[in-house]
Amino acid sequence: THIDRCLSCCSCMTTCPSGVNYMHLIDHARNHVEKTFKRPFLDRMIRTLLSNIIPKPMIFKFVVIMSKFVKPFKFLMPINLKSMLELSPNKIQKKTLKFQNLYRVERKKPTARVALLIGCVQRVVSPQINESTIRILTRHGVEVITMPEIECCGSLNHHLGKEDLAHETFKKNIDFWYEEYLKNGLDAIISNTSGCGTTVKDYGFVLRNDPQFKKKAKKISELTKDVTEFFDENLKLNFKKEERHTKKYNIAYHSACSMQHGQKIHNQPINLLKKTGNNILNIPDGHLCCGS
C-alpha cells in the first residue's frame, strides 16, 4: 500500500545526499508487486480500466464525453470511481489549429526540425498546449512534425507496474522516432508535458540491457528535450508586441515535480516567463509536490 501512495514526485531524489535513484527503485517495486500480489477485485478492475482507456486518445475522449452523463449517479458508485468521476473535465477543449503531420516554417529555411510528442491525455483535455507549442516553434523557424501513431509515452502502465505493456509502448515509440531520425533527421524530440518527458528520457536506462533496442533507446533519450529546455538552448525568443502587456503582472510559478526533480529543469521556464516582461515570484516550498 505504501508503494501505491508514492506519487513519483522524485523529491526524495533531489533531497537524498547520496544521489540514490529512487525513481528506478519505485518502478522496480511496482513491477514486483504487480507480479506477486493479488489485489482486490475492484482495485484490479480500476487499474485495468486506467491501463486500457487513458493511453488511447479516442477511447479516452469518448469516456470523458460520456462521464458527464454518469456524474449525476456517482453517489451510487464506490469511492474510487466516484473520485475519478469528480476529477473528469466537464467539457472537451476545442482545437483551434488544423491538425496535420507536418508544420512547415513560412518564408524561410528551417533552423531546426523536431518531433513533438502530442501525448494521450493532453491532446484530448488540453489540445491548446500542443497548438501553442507548434505556433511558437514555427514562428521561430523550427519545422515541427507530429506522429499520431505515438499515442502515449508509456508512463501510465510503467507506473502501474505493468512492465510488459509499458516496454511494448516504449519500443513502438522508439521505432517510429528512430526511423524518422534516420530518414529525414531530427534535432530534438520535444515534450511539453514534464511527466512524459521524464519517462522518454529514461528509455535508454530502462532498455539498457535489450540488445535490439539499447542503442536506439539511448539515442531517443538523448534527443528528448522539454520544450522550455529546447527554447532556452536553441532559440532567441522574440515576443510579439501584442504579447507584451502594458501592465506588468505578478506571476507565481510552481515547477512541476517531474520537471524540477525528474529532469532537473528549473531555471529555464522561469527565464522564459521573465522575457514576457512580467514579475515572476518564487513561492514558498516550491520544491514540494502539489499532490496531482
Regions found by a protein language model. Name each.
Residues T1, R5-H32, T199:
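Iron-sulfur cluster-binding cysteine motifs and their immediate structural context
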Residues M23-S292:
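Iron-sulfur cluster-binding electron-transfer modules in prokaryotic oxidoreductases
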